[in-house]
Amino acid sequence: ERERRGVLVVVADGMGGSRAGEVASRLAVETVIRVYREGAAGNPLADLYRAVETANQVVHSESVANPEMSGMGTTCTALVVRGGDAYLAHVGDSRAYLMQAGRMRQLTQDHSLVAQLVRDGQLSADQARSDPRRNVVTRSVGVSAHVEIDAQRFEALLREGDTLFMCSDGLHGLVQDEELSDLASEPSLSDGCKRAIV
């Protein structure tokens, strides 16, 4: 089954009052895993896209049905690795990186106000790190009935010794890309992340 479907990894970072963000991220992760496993299309990219799209519907429906959860949402970055190929479906500002031959490359594009301002040349990357609007996400799962999902297949991307690294802005918002690169090179990624945050 693993060879046919690949390995699925999901990062979701919830937003919303009280515990709504936690609920949104949990619902998104559970839904992506369940729908991807069902795999109606038999195509990893199509199944992954459908899984994130369904997660949006589930989170949005719960937000509408439950006043305590009104307006909740979450980022959602879902990655499937099958053979040397990687499949990615992405909404928000959580990130996926590839560490290959000592170089780190961001595979996702942040859906945030400051990232858009950087892309438009209105802010530098250094200015974006301290901009008070850096937490404003322009796309998220569950906030509206429909969401635009970035989906991409990276064919023959992976080689022996490569590392795929995923994180929310809770990590990439605290440490520079160079530090993330060092973390991705650590023998124990979880120990490196703990050291970076503390």
Language model: regions and residue ranges:
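PP2C/PPM-type serine/threonine phosphatase catalytic domain
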Residues: E1-V198
